[in-house]
């Protein structure tokens, strides 16, 4: 993979957004995660949180765009937690600033996303829950390169989703495997 092929626009699903909030002190400030935290009991849990930390450190330097959608916010609203909503709105504000950096708002996207998203109505994506399908559709429409999730189930269909929709669906560890070798150049 060359530097120009590094996936730089990343859609955060609600599980990733929630993890960023829950472990923000570790991810953004280098704080500690206590030994009794439940992340240690989740297979690859700490590794994914550590990868999120590395990803966000690279992203701070402006080389990544982190995207959310109205459907993302709806999932946050459904949780009914004000602190989570406030966090999501902060992340949405960051995404809006990424979009504002384009002189012509339309240049941030392409018509290809509309055609690819239309494929989601076909039976071949029946394994997606309604919520996942909405978020994947949003990510494709927003021309995201990566759909980042903490879930284990959705990445099992990553090859099919990438082949059909041109989006990589992965956990943070997988994304860091792609991004890490180039991190110093993205600074």
Per-range role (PLM):
Residues 1-4, 56-58:
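Short boundary motifs at domain starts and secondary-structure transition points
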Residues 93-126:
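Acidic catalytic patch
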Residues 42-45, 122-128:
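Short, flexible loop segments at the rims of nucleotide/cofactor-binding pockets, characterized by
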Residues 82-95, 156-164:
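Short, aromatic/basic amphipathic alpha-helical patches
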Residues 12, 20-84:
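PIN/NYN-family metal-dependent endoribonuclease catalytic core
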Residues 16, 72, 134-135, 153-154:
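Alpha-helix capping/helix-boundary segments
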Residues 2-11, 24-33, 125, 136-187:
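Acidic, PIN/NYN-like endoribonuclease modules and their adjacent C-terminal/linker elements
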Residues 131:
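Acidic donor-binding loop at a coil-to-helix junction in glycosyltransferase catalytic cores
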């Amino acid at each position: 993979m060359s530097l120009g092929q590094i996936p730089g626009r990343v859609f955060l699903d609600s599980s990733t957004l929630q993890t960023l909030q829950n472990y923000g002190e570790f991810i953004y400030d280098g704080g500690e995660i206590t030994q009794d935290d439940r992340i240690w009991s989740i297979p690859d849990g700490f590794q994914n949180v550590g990868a999120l930390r590395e990803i966000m450190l690279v992203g701070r330097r402006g080389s990544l765009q982190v995207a959310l959608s109205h459907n993302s916010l709806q999932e946050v609203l459904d949780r009914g937690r004000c602190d989570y909503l406030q966090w999501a709105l902060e992340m949405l504000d960051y995404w809006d600033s990424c979009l504002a950096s384009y002189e012509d708002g339309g240049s941030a996207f392409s018509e290809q996303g509309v055609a690819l998203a239309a494929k989601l109505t076909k039976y071949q994506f029946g394994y997606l829950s309604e919520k996942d399908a909405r978020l994947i559709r949003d990510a494709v429409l927003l021309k995201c390169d990566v759909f980042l999730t903490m879930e284990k189930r959705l990445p099992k269909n990553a090859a099919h989703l990438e082949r059909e929709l041109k989006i990589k669906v992965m956990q943070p560890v997988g994304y860091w495997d792609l991004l890490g070798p180039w991190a110093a150049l993205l600074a």
